[in-house]
């Protein structure tokens, strides 16, 4: 790919500003954990795996800001850093997975000097980024076989390189199928209200030379009924133990329409997106965002002033609508409760 979503460079975190795409390809530099937290909250970086990487790098930056005389004081202050990052966005479990991993690494390496702990945390954050890229490539390899020759694939939101350390989950499957020589095309839902499909997915696929057609969200059923959609592939922000999946708002509607039209609906996600502590999707916390995201577009009002607004950022697709969950370890179908549990066994 010709862009980098996030990287550690010269003890700074560099991110592409996704709020300014597709008009401008601008990279932002962050040298402290609070600014990384604001970047996550403000969706300069978004997508569950990507914000997990960002949170890990934020912890590494925060460790460098801590002034402490003892390991105990260092770990207490690091907990505060982690709390700030954890409060940014509540739904994507990768955020919390990455933070907990960084906390464990810090605790396990407190036998050396504090400077050594800081270096270990930096190395771990970079390792999380590198692992995510490798996981996405593996997801792509496992999922590519599900995409038939000549397929038209519908995707919702952006689960591409911009949502990960690179390559993508849902778009990773599409990329891998394209790289295998399959003649495929993509229909991208625009994905209101943030327009991740229009601004980000369309931009990514066009840069890669993969044929893509943009549609508004309420057109998906029309094209499904006409037989123009072969399958659907989306990403995930959190997957409960029974396979219920939280993803960008509107995903549930796509899944229901796909089921009605006998179109397979696949979820692509790394195992770090699994939350087996939750029995089902009803327990997944759903982030509600500011009304202005709905009432304004590109800074201009598109609704009457003072109108009541609801703006959940995610919805939950019940497992019964999902034909398969594509992970870096393979494709899971059928009894998700048993198979997901087996998937993460050490």
Swiss-Prot record:
Entry's EC annotation: 5.3.1.23
Keyword set, alphabetical order: Amino-acid biosynthesis, Isomerase, Methionine biosynthesis
Keyword S-adenosyl-L-methionine: no
Active site: 237 (proton donor)
Pathway(s) per entry: Amino-acid biosynthesis; L-methionine biosynthesis via salvage pathway; L-methionine from S-methyl-5-thio-alpha-D-ribose 1-phosphate: step 1/6
Cystines in this chain: none
Reactions that this protein is recorded to catalyse: 5-(methylsulfanyl)-alpha-D-ribose 1-phosphate = 5-(methylsulfanyl)-D-ribulose 1-phosphate
Recorded GO MF terms: S-methyl-5-thioribose-1-phosphate isomerase activity
Record GO biological process: L-methionine salvage from methylthioadenosine
Domain of life, per lineage: Bacteria
Residues the record lists as binding substrate: 46-48, 89, 196, 247-248
Site, Transition state stabilizer: residue positions: 157
Function of the protein: Catalyzes the interconversion of methylthioribose-1-phosphate (MTR-1-P) into methylthioribulose-1-phosphate (MTRu-1-P).
PANTHER family tied to this protein: METHYLTHIORIBOSE-1-PHOSPHATE ISOMERASE
Family statement: Belongs to the eIF-2B alpha/beta/delta subunits family. MtnA subfamily.
Protein name, UniProt field: Methylthioribose-1-phosphate isomerase
Lineage of the species this protein comes from: Bacteria, Pseudomonadati, Thermodesulfobacteriota, Desulfuromonadia, Geobacterales
Gene coding for it: mtnA
